Amino acid sequence: MNTTLFHPYSFLLLGIPGLESMHLWVGFPFFAVFLTAVLGNITILFVIQTDSSLHHPMFYFLAILSSIDPGLSTSTIPKMLGTFWFTLREISFEGCLTQMFFIHLCTGMESAVLVAMAYDCYVAICDPLCYTLVLTNKVVSVMALAIFLRPLVFVIPFVLFILRLPFCGHQIIPHTYGEHMGIARLSCASIRVNIIYGLCAISILVFDIIAIVISYVQILCAVFLLSSHDARLKAFSTCGSHVCVMLTFYMPAFFSFMTHRFGRNIPHFIHILLANFYVVIPPALNSVIYGVRTKQIRAQVLKMFFNK
């Protein structure tokens, strides 16, 4: 079979169908979000690296999150801006698969690190005397390796399942980026395997959410048992940033899934915007949330920029 029919030379990304006339203006907030994500997370990484007092598990996990976020932003927004501002809609088949790979990899890693951060909060509040015994450097290193390897194992089949599909000349993707099911739906063959595997991958995110909820139920029980009002406030402050980041990541994903599954009468551009929020907004807000709410990070950033 002709390889250009089996696998097209390139795909065309339409951007946000229905808002083509506004692409120029839509690009500006996306550009601002991109700058915030990259500069904010680089700042957090720099602060954690240079301040030895922050070299403990909570900030190690934050450093991992701040390493993932620029990757997720870079996987999506530069190509979006090319589509919005310069009508550079074409993306090679290999480039589209590469983009899909990194979007799903970074998304999986972000979910995994949020579980690790929930566990860190759980140990810090429910068993503080054993914190340094439980979360040793070795344990944190193993968790960091798992954060990378688990999504890698689950994402590689996405690429393989796309490579097995013929496309018969279909190459228009009504989206701003290439993701697994968006590419698979262009195929002229059965995508049943892709759908089943996609649901299995989503179940991993559901498992992560359940693990986080269980952790926070136990954390809340422990907090309400504290006799001191100040101790309760300190406990809430310890995990407040993580809760905000968790909601920022999972809520857009939840609404995107629900509108895709049940919102058949919702305009298509709403689906695309929600899918963009899911991968674009969290990387920017994470750095802002931790920069504002975490006292140690905020103090170091202020010192770095305003102390003479």
Swiss-Prot record:
Residues 1-24, 75-98, 160-195, 257-271 are extracellular. Disulfide bonds join 96-188. Its main location: membrane. Signal peptide: none annotated. The chain crosses the membrane at residues 25-45, 54-74, 99-119, 139-159, 196-215, 236-256, 272-292. GO terms for molecular function: G protein-coupled receptor activity; olfactory receptor activity. It is a multi-pass membrane protein. It comes from the Eukaryota. Keywords: Cell membrane, Disulfide bond, G-protein coupled receptor, Glycoprotein, Membrane, Olfaction, Receptor, Sensory transduction, Transducer, Transmembrane, Transmembrane helix. SUPFAM superfamilies: Family A G protein-coupled receptor-like. One of its GO terms (cellular component) is plasma membrane. Belongs to the G-protein coupled receptor 1 family. This is Olfactory receptor 52E1. It comes from Homo sapiens. The lineage of its organism: Eukaryota, Metazoa, Chordata, Craniata, Vertebrata. The gene is OR52E1.
